[in-house]
Structure formats: structure tokens, C-alpha cells
Amino acid sequence: MRRIAVLGLVVAVLFSTVAPAAAASTPSGGPGASYAFVHDPSMIREGSTYYVFSTGDPAGVVGRGNIQIRTSGNLRTWRYVGTVFPRIPPWILRLVGPIPNLWAPDISYFDGLYHLYYAGSSFGSNTSVIALATNVTLDLSSPRYHWVDRGAVVSSGPGDDYNAIDPALVRGPSSTWLAFGSFWGGIKLVAIDPATGKPDTTHPRVLSLASTAAPDAEEGSYITSHDGYFYLFVSTGFCCRGIASTYQVVVGRSRSITGPYVDAYGTPMEQGGGTELLGADQGMIGPGSGSVYHAGSTYLFDYHYYDAYDGGAARLQIRHLYWTSSGWPVTGPPLVPVPGSPAGGG
């Protein structure tokens, strides 16, 4: 465990200099943007519309590097509708240096607001920050639609044993937490004050949930609950290498949000455990960085993979999650068709 040193001061200084963010930018990237570069997706539904938020395109072709938004009414056909911000917030550039894109958003709804956590990071280092933006609605046509930049949540740098990327909020019966992390110590967990969306100063410790030595270090974590257990999904291996990516998704479970999490064989995830949920299959290379959409008895796992039939392009995919008699998740067939891929690809 590790305490968040001087984070409250950093957050206060940054937030005091941040103006409210503008509405989503005008879609760019042409007609193919709806399927181009979907990485690190996070899905939610408002009304009859599903929304997927995903990492900004580092090439700037789609959305100029900002968090992308796509919508669907049926989970199969998706339309790119713009970005959360018109540009990367200047305070992030001042904190982590020049970066081409924002990473790995996580969208949730509580206390009357949509909370979007996301990261800015210098690739290959742990000079990173997790930030928060809020909105009262996701309906881009609503006059109430407006993203407010709430500033920094967790930051990291040389000397820290964690990397402040890949945020994922989880709410328990009486507490709220944020999972995050990657290389530099694996998956961490910090208590969140739901009134602010920021770390709870009465519980300032950073807890450790999962750790494996490179090259199979975990990142892209997500926690959901089912039938008395909390399930921790993580991606192991390497992302971001197209068809050379080695990502796969593994899972462990615990009776408590804070762990310890173990796999189906009882191996602790802090000791490299994890039961495989998804691996490479035909044209689907490096599946990972997934999140779980949960509504009633429905569980959907949304993730990205690299399309071997299209030069390793990053694609969105969604599958139903089902549960075995022993309480472990398994995935159903893919829901999202990808142009140019054989039937069932993804």
C-alpha cells in the first residue's frame, strides 16, 4: 500500500486553473470514422441510445487525439459523433508534456451526473494523470449537454510505484473506488468520495490488486459484481502493436472490492493469477482493455482488438457475458460486424 502524497494540493491548484470544457467537437475523419481506431472502449446507455467512449486517435485523423464518442441503438451499428473536448486540455499538457492523445476513458452515472474518467500519459513512462469530466446528459442535441473539466484525480511520476492510467470506477453497497494502473506496480485501487469524484481524503492509501512481471504485466482493469462476488478483469501482455499485439483478458474474483482476488485455481492475482476470458482467435488479435456494461441480468463485455483482416486496425467488439455454474464468466459470440472481415471475425 502507498499513500497519495500531496495529491490534494496538486488537484486544488490544477482545478483552480481549469475552465469548463466545450461541448463535443464536430465529427471529423470521413465516413469511415465510425469504425476507425476504437481503442479502450467504455459503454453506457442513456434512454434508448448506447454510447461508447474510447481513446483518442494518436494520428489525429479521427477527433484530433481527443476522447471519441460513438452511438448505437442496437449494439451492432455504431456512428462516430465527435469528441468530449475540442482539444486536449492545456493543463494536462503542462503536467505530462506534449502528448498526441488522451487515453482509456471510463464512463459511469451516479448522483445525477455522468462521470468520465480518462488519462493523459507520456507513452512508455509513468508520467501520467487521471482526470475527470462530468455532464448532466449524453444527448448531444440537448441544450443541457456540456462537459465540465473537473481536473486531476490521481497523478504519477518517477518515484511512484504505480502508473495513473486506465481508470475504472466501481461502486459497492457503501463505498466507491477507482481501479487503475499498468506497468510500474500493476493494478491499484483508491477510495473515491462520490460527492466530488476525487480521492477520499479519509482513506488516502493506494491498495494493490494485481501484479505480474513484464512482459505480461496487467493493465486495462475493470471490476463488476455478480452473485456475491466482485470480478476483476485485466489485460495482460502488450497492446498497441497491431497484429503483433499479445493482449489477452484474464479475470479473478473476490468477496470484497478491495480483494484479495484469485483465479479459478485459487492463485492470487497479486502473484500473477488470472483465468483466461479472451485470447487471440483467427482474425481477432490482442483482445483487451475491456469494460462491463451491466443492466439487470444483462452483462456485456466491450473491448478492442486488432483486426488481422485490415492490417491490424483497432476495432470495437462487444460480447454477452454468461456465468458458469461455478460462477465464472464466459463470453458469447461477437455482436459487432466489421466491414471486410469474415463472418464471426472479432
Question: Where on the chain are the PLM-derived regions?
Answer:
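Carbohydrate-active catalytic/glycan-binding domains of CAZyme proteins
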Residues: A24-G346
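Secretory targeting and sorting signals
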Residues: M1-A24
